[in-house]
């Protein structure tokens, strides 16, 4: 079928695509070096921010004054899930934890949700004003997005919240669909909009895959007429953020009636008590992990009950979660989320008609862990053009390639937007998930695949079956 949407390959800023990225969930290996752990834990022990998780999923009247009377300062509250963030001493936090209406008090750890490390550099050509970007978007062909557009489905009227590290609010591929009034930041000291001077921004790249506009310019997203809202929950500088920011961002997205949340973020925790932070792994009580998981599940459930479909990246650790029972992936390991693994071609430039659905070399997997798969790109081809196996999308000031389950998740979020748009909006997340999985292409495993879950999403089938 011919593509009815075409894009002029232009560059509004001259850029050189010299650095390529592997992004999404941190892949740091858990260590048992007690010396290292103790050193990092000692550094973390000076943290003063705690999450107060109440037994009820609400905040009682007079809560702030009550906390102040005990010697704590309330920094924020998320009453919809009964969670508050306080600044307090260890002694005061212990006193609060003993109150009858408090379920638990846990440190609000700053977690490394996105690996900031660059993938080894390549030296592709600079993008010129006379080139076409569309031909490089192999992921759109893999999921039959052009065929879906030809049916008239483009995500019109659907709101997608991008919970990430902000968005470049000036990018011409994004501004037509970006709701700046609703965009918000939950990162202390940072605006939702990415500041100038950063070559790569994770959230900007993700947003382009979801809903870069059909404007005869640059790239195009899976749902080119969907509205996107930047909900900044990670620092644009480090890719890290506290649990409370993630939870508050999820609730906010639901409150503004987002139809879809995309979270191309995640971290692997050990159920016995290890947390990945920007300073390394720290050892914490296992019960803290359980309570942190409980609080985040509350946020997910709130959004789900409010009609928001939640799409998340499965992770980049190459872990089989069917056999690693001690590992916990958040948020992909929670209920009521669509967890997305990554696929890619191999030497696509040299073999453009080859398989586009090879499981990516890094992707986390497992029948218990993956809902569906989608294009995420890879970098293991020996070809001199290996970077074309990655996903091309928007970055501040231009476009760049990147690979990871972070790139797979927005493909699925875009397809979810197409489904909801066809339904006229306000669609039950359970029904969205059902349509995604029922129309996914079964690549192996008869719809229960180790790497693909129910299959690789198919945009055309999703809006026609």
Pin down the residues of each PLM region.
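Bacterial N-terminal signal peptides that target proteins for export
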Residues: 2-13
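Autoinhibitory propeptides
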Residues: 64-134, 347, 358
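Structural recognition of the beta-strand scaffold that forms the well-ordered cores
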Residues: 51, 85, 159-163, 208, ...
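Mature extracellular/periplasmic domains of secretome proteins
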Residues: 149-155, 198-200, 220-223, 240-263, ...
């Amino acid at each position: 079928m011919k593509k009815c949407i075409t894009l002029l390959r232009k560059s509004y800023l001259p850029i050189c695509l010299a650095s390529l990225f592997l992004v999404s969930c941190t892949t740091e290996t858990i260590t048992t070096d007690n010396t290292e752990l103790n050193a990092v834990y000692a550094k973390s022990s000076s943290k003063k921010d705690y999450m107060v998780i109440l037994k009820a999923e609400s905040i009682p009247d007079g809560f702030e004054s009550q906390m102040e009377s005990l010697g704590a300062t309330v920094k924020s509250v998320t009453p919809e899930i009964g969670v508050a963030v306080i600044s307090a001493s260890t002694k005061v936090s212990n006193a609060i934890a003993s109150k009858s209406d408090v379920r638990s008090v846990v440190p609000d750890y700053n977690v490394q949700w996105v690996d900031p490390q660059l993938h080894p550099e390549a030296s592709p050509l600079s993008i010129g004003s006379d080139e076409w970007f569309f031909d490089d978007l192999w992921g759109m062909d893999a999921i039959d997005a052009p065929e879906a557009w030809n049916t008239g489905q483009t995500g019109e009227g659907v709101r997608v919240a991008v919970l990430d590290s902000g968005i470049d609010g000036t990018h011409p591929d994004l501004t037509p669909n970006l709701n700046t009034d609703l965009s918000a930041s939950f990162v202390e000291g940072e605006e939702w909009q990415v500041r100038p001077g950063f070559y790569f921004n994770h959230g900007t790249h993700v947003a382009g895959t979801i809903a870069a506009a059909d404007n005869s310019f640059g790239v195009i997203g899976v749902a080119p007429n969907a509205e996107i809202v930047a909900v900044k929950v990670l620092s644009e500088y480090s890719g890290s953020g506290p649990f409370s920011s993630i939870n508050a961002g999820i609730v906010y997205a639901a409150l503004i009636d987002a139809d879809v949340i995309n979270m191309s973020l995640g971290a692997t925790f050990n159920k016995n008590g290890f947390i990945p932070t920007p300073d390394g792994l720290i050892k914490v009580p296992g019960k803290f992990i359980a309570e942190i998981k409980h609080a985040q599940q509350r946020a997910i459930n709130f959004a789900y009950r409010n009609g928001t479909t939640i799409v998340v990246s499965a992770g980049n650790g190459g872990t089989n979660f069917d056999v690693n029972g001690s590992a916990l992936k958040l948020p992909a390991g929670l209920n009521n989320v669509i967890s997305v693994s990554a696929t890619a071609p191999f030497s696509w430039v040299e073999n453009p008609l080859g398989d586009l659905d090879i499981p990516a070399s890094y992707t986390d997997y497992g029948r218990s862990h993956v809902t569906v798969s989608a294009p995420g790109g890879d970098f293991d081809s020996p070809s001199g053009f290996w970077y074309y196996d990655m996903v091309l999308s928007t970055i501040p000031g231009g476009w760049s390639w990147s690979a990871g389950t972070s790139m797979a998740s927005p493909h699925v979020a875009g397809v979810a937007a197409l489904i909801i748009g066809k339904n006229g909006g306000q669609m039950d997340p359970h029904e969205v998930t059902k349509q995604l999985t029922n129309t996914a292409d079964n690549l192996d495993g008869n719809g229960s695949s180790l790497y693909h879950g129910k299959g690789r999403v198919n945009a055309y089938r999703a809006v026609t079956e």
